[in-house]
Amino acid sequence: MTPTELKTAVERRRTFAIISHPDAGKTTITEQLLLFGGVIRQAGTVKGKKSGQFAKSDWMDIEKQRGISVTSSVMQFDYAGKRINILDTPGHEDFSEDTYRTLMAVDAAVMVIDSAKGIEPQTKKLFKVCKMRGIPIFTFMNKLDRDGREPLDLIAELEELLDIEGCAMNWPIGMGKDLRGLYDIANKRIEMYRPEDEANPYLALDEEGKIAGDNPLKEDSVYTQALDDIELIGEAGNAYDPAKIATGDQTPIFFGSALTNFGVKTFLEAFVDMAPAPEAHQTQEETQVEPTNEDFSGFIFKIQANMNPAHRDRIAFVRVCSGEFQRGIDVTLTRTGKKMRLNNSTEFMADAREQVTSAVAGDIVGLYDTGNFQIGDTIHTGKEAISFEKLPQFTPELFMRVTAKNVMKQKSFHKGIQQLVQEGAIQLYKTYTTSDYILGAVGQLQFEVFQYRMQHEYNSEVIMEPIGSRTARWIDPEKLDQSMSSSRNLLVKDIHDQPLFLFENKFAERWFQDKYPEVKLTAKL
């Protein structure tokens, strides 16, 4: 690929994640985007367990059974001359670690909000990570087909709770059973809800921004209310500011209904136009790697075992940051200095795959992994070793002791634990004295998924013994004395052999600090 071709290819890319609180409609809008991208012909409903239809992005059996996303899926398609990479993230709060890591691999985020509920806790958490990264955030106020809160109230709440300017790009004309359409502020037209002519769902507006000609909607109170609201936000609202959007200080707000596929196409067309192409990535050496740099580089943000249960494979997901990835490329793994040839690579449509021959900045490539990679690894072709910024790691809050139910199946038990831990699906610790396995998780559902996958993917039933909620704190190995351990502060080591204590409660932690003031206790995120 010539430098000009590389630049053109990079400028076509739009790589983003969809974030939301559970049940705000994230998976439904993902499906509708795939529908417009020609990837699927019919949108499934993630809740439709009885109908046997499942969301394309929910490919793991447990996701289909429970109607939730527990892993990040990657989907790619072309639309309006752009190459779209969607990273669908787990909506369930117990899987925030996977979601946070995914947000490190995107150039923008789409925040889906239930217009009946407004800003919810998980939305707030994920928004903070996007804000911290300074990436553009686009808002889709969903479920307009149901009665919800007033649009002005929703925007006011968003601005107050998330500390970001909101800029409405369209405006609802009614909602629920009174939903008539969307006033497209940017394009000066009205998109009708359930129009008589589906091929042309738009109403033209006159120079004053009102419906041209005769139309019964003119006399409808929801239309006049919408005009009043639009006049108000025109005078007192925030002006559209691309510079503020680029830095994550302003969010364009679109209203619609993913379930009825209303307003989604308008959103997609605006998004591909407004969202950024891949930009420079910061390294730990505090240098910037430009996407058009001729040397290939990328980082691994996710590892997934058993995407194809028939082959028991393991895929490392790489975000390409610069240069061109080609099949058979020779790269260096920065962490070990090891050189390797990447012959087996793939691109995704959830669990469906195709061999990838070429990829550029913004693309997500799957590498078949035999155990070489870890989450956070950097690979590159340049002479100078580089390491991209570290991915966030979290302090677990819940812990369980885990053992194999059948002692004759120790091999599959150990393999399953090793692979699921390397995925980042759960955290693993060993006790110093007995080498018992202790699992750490952010939420209870992680344990359930771990237990399910051990049984169904590794044929290893496990016994999970709760040791309760504990406070995990790491210490300097040089300060460690095993006599510090007790039943109230369990001494364990992580997968990097770093020592830490699992304190029974805050009181136990304070008691320890008073007794050993010279020992510094640290937490992850």
UniProtKB/Swiss-Prot annotation:
<dbReference type="GO" id="GO:0005525">
    <property type="term" value="F:GTP binding"/>
</dbReference>
<dbReference type="InterPro" id="IPR035647">
    <property type="entry name" value="EFG_III/V"/>
</dbReference>
<keyword id="KW-0342">GTP-binding</keyword>
<dbReference type="Pfam" id="PF22042">
    <property type="entry name" value="EF-G_D2"/>
</dbReference>
<dbReference type="InterPro" id="IPR004548">
    <property type="entry name" value="PrfC"/>
</dbReference>
<dbReference type="InterPro" id="IPR027417">
    <property type="entry name" value="P-loop_NTPase"/>
</dbReference>
<dbReference type="GO" id="GO:0016150">
    <property type="term" value="F:translation release factor activity, codon nonspecific"/>
</dbReference>
<feature type="binding site">
    <location>
        <begin position="142"/>
        <end position="145"/>
    </location>
    <ligand>
        <name>GTP</name>
    </ligand>
</feature>
<dbReference type="GO" id="GO:0005829">
    <property type="term" value="C:cytosol"/>
</dbReference>
<dbReference type="InterPro" id="IPR053905">
    <property type="entry name" value="EF-G-like_DII"/>
</dbReference>
<dbReference type="InterPro" id="IPR009000">
    <property type="entry name" value="Transl_B-barrel_sf"/>
</dbReference>
<dbReference type="InterPro" id="IPR038467">
    <property type="entry name" value="RF3_dom_3_sf"/>
</dbReference>
<dbReference type="InterPro" id="IPR032090">
    <property type="entry name" value="RF3_C"/>
</dbReference>
<feature type="binding site">
    <location>
        <begin position="20"/>
        <end position="27"/>
    </location>
    <ligand>
        <name>GTP</name>
    </ligand>
</feature>
<protein>
    <recommendedName>
        <fullName>Peptide chain release factor 3</fullName>
    </recommendedName>
</protein>
<dbReference type="GO" id="GO:0016149">
    <property type="term" value="F:translation release factor activity, codon specific"/>
</dbReference>
<keyword id="KW-0963">Cytoplasm</keyword>
<dbReference type="InterPro" id="IPR041732">
    <property type="entry name" value="RF3_GTP-bd"/>
</dbReference>
<comment type="similarity">
    <text>Belongs to the TRAFAC class translation factor GTPase superfamily. Classic translation factor GTPase family. PrfC subfamily.</text>
</comment>
<keyword id="KW-0648">Protein biosynthesis</keyword>
<comment type="function">
    <text>Increases the formation of ribosomal termination complexes and stimulates activities of RF-1 and RF-2. It binds guanine nucleotides and has strong preference for UGA stop codons. It may interact directly with the ribosome. The stimulation of RF-1 and RF-2 is significantly reduced by GTP and GDP, but not by GMP.</text>
</comment>
<feature type="binding site">
    <location>
        <begin position="88"/>
        <end position="92"/>
    </location>
    <ligand>
        <name>GTP</name>
    </ligand>
</feature>
<dbReference type="InterPro" id="IPR005225">
    <property type="entry name" value="Small_GTP-bd"/>
</dbReference>
<dbReference type="Pfam" id="PF00009">
    <property type="entry name" value="GTP_EFTU"/>
</dbReference>
<dbReference type="InterPro" id="IPR031157">
    <property type="entry name" value="G_TR_CS"/>
</dbReference>
<dbReference type="Pfam" id="PF16658">
    <property type="entry name" value="RF3_C"/>
</dbReference>
<keyword id="KW-0547">Nucleotide-binding</keyword>
<feature type="domain" description="tr-type G">
    <location>
        <begin position="11"/>
        <end position="279"/>
    </location>
</feature>
<dbReference type="InterPro" id="IPR000795">
    <property type="entry name" value="T_Tr_GTP-bd_dom"/>
</dbReference>
<dbReference type="GO" id="GO:0003924">
    <property type="term" value="F:GTPase activity"/>
</dbReference>
<dbReference type="GO" id="GO:0006449">
    <property type="term" value="P:regulation of translational termination"/>
</dbReference>
